[in-house]
Amino acid sequence: MRLLHTMLRVGDLQRSIAFYTNVLGMKLLRTSENPEYKYSLAFVGYGPETEEAVIELTYNWGVESYDMGNAYGHIALSVDNAAEACERIRQNGGNVTREAGPVKGGSTIIAFVEDPDGYKIELIEAKDAGRGLGN
C-alpha cells in the first residue's frame, strides 16, 4: 500500500491553490470541475501523483466555510484490488463503509473503510490511482 492524498475542503479554491503553490512551493498538478455534482478540485504536491502523496483541495460550489468538525476528508491508500482489500480488512475486524465500485461521475474503482477512531480511509485500485475520476 502507498499513501496517495489527503483531501481538504476549502472555501476559496484559488486562495488555497495560491497558498499551497506560492507559500509552500507545491506544484499545481491538475484541476477539474464537475458541474453535475457542483464541485471543483485541485491537486497540489511536490511530485507526480504516481510517485508522491499529494493534497486534494475540494471546493463545493456555494460553500464558503467549514467548521473544523467537518473540514477533514480522508486519507487515501493505493491497493492492487479494492474488493480484496476490503475483504482482508473486514476479516481482520475493520469496518468497511463503502464496498469497492466506481466513483460517482467516473470509472475509478474505490472503497472506504474507517479506522478505530472513525477517520475515513479511501482505498483506490493502483491501476486507477492517477486517473482522477477515470474520465
Curated annotation (Swiss-Prot):
Example of a GO MF term: metal ion binding
Enzyme Commission number(s) from the entry: 4.4.1.5
Broad enzyme group: lyase
Cofactor: Ni(2+)
Pathway: Secondary metabolite metabolism; methylglyoxal degradation; (R)-lactate from methylglyoxal: step 1/2
Any Pfam family matching the protein: Glyoxalase
InterPro entries membership: Glyas_Bleomycin-R_OHBP_Dase, Glyas_Fos-R_dOase_dom, Glyoxalase_1, Glyoxalase_1_CS, VOC
Record keywords: Lyase, Metal-binding, Nickel
Binding site residues for Ni(2+): H5, E56, H74, E122
Assigned GO CC terms: cytoplasm
SUPFAM superfamilies: Glyoxalase/Bleomycin resistance protein/Dihydroxybiphenyl dioxygenase
Catalytic activity: (R)-S-lactoylglutathione = methylglyoxal + glutathione
Domain VOC: 2-126
Active site: E122 (proton donor/acceptor)
GO biological process: methylglyoxal catabolic process to D-lactate via S-lactoyl-glutathione
Subunit comment: Homodimer.
Homology family: Belongs to the glyoxalase I family.
Protein name as annotated: Lactoylglutathione lyase
Native organism: Salmonella typhimurium (strain LT2 / SGSC1412 / ATCC 700720)
Top-level taxonomy: Bacteria, Pseudomonadati, Pseudomonadota, Gammaproteobacteria, Enterobacterales
